[in-house]
Amino acid sequence: MAPTEIKTLSFLDSSKSNYNLNPLKFQGGFAFKRKDSGCTAAKRVHCSAQSQSPPPAWPGRAFPEPGRMTWEGPKPISVIGSTGSIGTQTLDIVAENPDKFRIVALAAGSNVTLLADQVKAFKPKLVSVKDESLISELKEALAGFEDMPEIIPGEQGMIEVARHPDAVTVVTGIVGCAGLKPTVAAIEAGKDIALANKETLIAGGPFVLPLAKKHNVKILPADSEHSAIFQCIQGLPEGALRRIILTASGGAFRDLPVEKLKEVKVADALKHPNWNMGKKITVDSATLFNKGLEVIEAHYLFGAEYDDIEIVIHPQSIIHSMVETQDSSVLAQLGWPDMRLPILYTLSWPERIYCSEITWPRLDLCKVDLTFKKPDNVKYPSMDLAYAAGRAGGTMTGVLSAANEKAVEMFIDEKIGYLDIFKVVELTCDKHRSEMAVSPSLEEIVHYDQWARDYAATVLKSAGLSPALV
């Protein structure tokens, strides 16, 4: 491909003062037009490679099935990514509720010191570390510990943790496509999934969802937005869901004029107004790519059409998302911005567990404001890209996610500018059109995830913030 400038994203050209966004168009006719109603300018895409959507995890409503409780005592749980943010918060919940939950297996990366502390505290039967070289270090850290677990390294170790015979629910807290194979193994073993790994659905939805249906596995969302939707659809009658409304904080630049975006630095993007999160997700909040990816997740989880999934800016992050029913009623889930609540609900569902207000502050609505505004498609072109990729389906959604992950990595490393993130993602998706797999296998999903990262890495900044391929 020759060096390319995306002229349709006009605000990327610093020489222009008019910031109207023309309809985006990928080369070769990958275009969409807008409708004017709703909180976002929803898009209709015309693309020859449009796949039939896989069966949703929760088709617009949620009911517990009688007889699913097959264990005695505390629910047995495996955790993939135990030393990460989701994993440590999960273990905090287990420690606070030993009569409700117990840990049977843990998979971690290379933080052996923390993993050893977790093993001593929760006494799992099986643990996994990133590679074989860490086994001796872990054994040394556990010297003298009586309840020494079995230790299996690498990807196979994660898979064994995921399908441990005693586990009922598997928490998938690992980032990226590395979490896809263990999730598939857990589903094939009949384990319910507490899903905190976005790639499982965004990249793997066309493969994972039919598999979950085949094995009668429940996929329970552990992120705040989809947990909110899941909570709102409890008990809804069939066909009652009309619209999904995803709330977004707006990120670090929600109040910054569009013309100032070309000047922002990495440190600016990492100043989230509400949440304390990792670097990648904080940048995703600034670009609103996190919300675009959540639109795709909502489609796969709940079966809503893309025209019926909307985004609204809610600066306070108190309402985590909403659903509208056919009679125009709007149901919302509210709470402090605290990831522990959605994680807890994936473990306790369909039950509600009492939480002490000492460690779980209660919401006082008299002390908070609730405001909303329409998101700006010029400031956040990620929304258009996500809707287009979602409608294309197949491997395009995984390519979008992987390209964004690589672009954010390059931005954090100061190899590209903030506005180049959007260009890198669009160029990568455009290149993928010619070889997109409509109904991909697991191997194709993993292959194109890596392809997208490699291709995105070839897009470099050149004069005038216009990317060029090398």
Swiss-Prot record:
Binding of 1-deoxy-D-xylulose 5-phosphate, residues: 198, 224-225, 249, 272, 285, 290-291, 294
Leading EC class: oxidoreductase
Location relative to the cell: Plastid, Chloroplast
Catalytic activity: 2-C-methyl-D-erythritol 4-phosphate + NADP(+) = 1-deoxy-D-xylulose 5-phosphate + NADPH + H(+)
UniProt xrefs under Pfam families: DXP_redisom_C, DXP_reductoisom, DXPR_C
UniProt KW keywords: Chloroplast, Isoprene biosynthesis, Manganese, Metal-binding, NADP, Oxidoreductase, Plastid, Transit peptide
Record GO biological process: isopentenyl diphosphate biosynthetic process, methylerythritol 4-phosphate pathway involved in terpenoid biosynthetic process
GO molecular function, one term: NADPH binding
Sites where the protein binds NADPH: 83-86, 109, 111, 197, 199, 278
Gene Ontology cellular component list: chloroplast
EC number: 1.1.1.267
Disulfide-bond pairs as recorded: none
InterPro entries reported in the protein's UniProt record: DXP_reductoisomerase (IPR003821), DXP_reductoisomerase_C (IPR013644), DXP_reductoisomerase_N (IPR013512), DXPR_C (IPR026877), DXPR_C_sf (IPR036169), NAD(P)-bd_dom_sf (IPR036291)
Family assignment from sequence similarity: Belongs to the DXR family.
NCBIfam families with a match to the protein in the record: Dxr (TIGR00243), PRK12464.1 (NF009114)
Primary role: Catalyzes the NADPH-dependent rearrangement and reduction of 1-deoxy-D-xylulose-5-phosphate (DXP) to 2-C-methyl-D-erythritol 4-phosphate (MEP).
Name of protein: 1-deoxy-D-xylulose 5-phosphate reductoisomerase, chloroplastic
